[in-house]
């Protein structure tokens, strides 16, 4: 097991336990155990803390405010086909890999599918562009069709010739996206980097760290500009916070990691 493997597995494990919904589940289990052990005072305090946590993190407006600090860091650029870009780098996450894609032989776009459709839009707009689709699987136990192979099928179905497509089929995270994609790109070429807006700060930092000349093209925005501070949703609010925490801690971990890891 090399340093890339250690980093990948550690990030997956920490990421799982730092999700708010998982932390609340653990806290509820502890509260039940405390009640069962007759430690009612401590159990009641923990129950109140759980209720306050759910109340705050379920607030949609607060989650939007947090997420906008990531999504607003890079504006949507104006792209001209003669600006000297080699093409579009798409970071995986917009197509579901797995057994369904393999069994149905059909790419399964998900709620981050804007990454893939924006790349297609730019390819159709600029006939001189190529697409470099970078991903294998972020799963601990990948099975079925990889996302890269699903993306290959998607672009084939959309009529994009193979001469304009490049597929990096090893990476499991953003660090490896930047590291492994360098095998397919000529030094000094300019690229357009497409990924979700909340993911873009970490992606840009990582790609520039590996010497890439990229411009950010954020997609898949989740945070509205309207307040919605009187709106609560455990699904939307907590999931937005999970995304914010994941990206913020991910950026911190990448900063702490040696560039030659």
Give the residues covered by each predicted segment:
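Structural signal for membrane-spanning alpha-helices in multi-pass inner-membrane proteins
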Residues: 32-35, 58, 254
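A structural signal for short, hydrophobic/glycine-enriched beta-strand patches
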Residues: 56-237
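Hydrophobic membrane-insertion alpha-helices, especially the h-region
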Residues: 45-60
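Membrane-interface helix-boundary motifs at transmembrane edges
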Residues: 35-44
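Extracytoplasmic/luminal low-complexity segments enriched in Pro/Gly and acidic/polar residues
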Residues: 220, 226-232, 241-261
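Transmembrane helix-loop junctions in multipass membrane proteins, especially transporters and channels
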Residues: 40, 72-76, 258-259
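Membrane-embedded alpha-helical segments of integral membrane proteins
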Residues: 1-36
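Hydrophobic alpha-helical segments of integral membrane proteins
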Residues: 6-14, 62, 66-70, 245-252
């Amino acid at each position: 097991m090399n340093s890339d493997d250690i980093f990948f597995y550690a990030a997956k494990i920490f990421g799982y336990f730092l999700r708010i919904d998982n932390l609340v589940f653990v806290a509820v289990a502890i509260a039940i155990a405390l009640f069962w052990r007759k430690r009612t005072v401590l159990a009641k305090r923990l129950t109140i803390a759980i209720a306050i946590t759910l109340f705050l993190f379920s607030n949609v407006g607060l989650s939007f405010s947090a997420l906008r600090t990531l999504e607003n860091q890079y504006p949507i650029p104006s792209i001209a086909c003669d600006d000297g870009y080699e093409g579009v780098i798409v970071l995986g996450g917009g197509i579901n890999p797995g057994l369904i894609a393999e069994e149905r032989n059909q790419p399964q776009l998900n709620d981050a599918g804007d990454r893939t459709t924006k790349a297609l839009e730019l390819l159709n707009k600029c006939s001189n562009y190529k697409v470099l689709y970078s991903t294998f699987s972020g799963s601990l136990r990948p099975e079925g069709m990889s996302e890269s192979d699903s993306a290959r099928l998607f672009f084939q179905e959309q009529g994009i010739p193979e001469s304009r497509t490049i597929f990096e089929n090893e990476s499991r995270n953003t660090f490896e996206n930047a590291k492994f994609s360098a095998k397919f790109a000529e030094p000094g070429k300019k690229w357009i980097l497409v990924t979700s807006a909340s993911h873009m700060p970490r992606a840009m930092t990582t790609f520039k760290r590996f010497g890439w000349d990229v411009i950010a093209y954020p997609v898949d925005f989740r945070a509205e500009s309207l307040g919605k501070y009187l709106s609560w949703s455990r699904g939307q609010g907590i999931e937005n916070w999970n995304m914010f925490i994941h990206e913020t801690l991910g950026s911190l971990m990448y900063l702490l990691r040696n560039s030659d890891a």
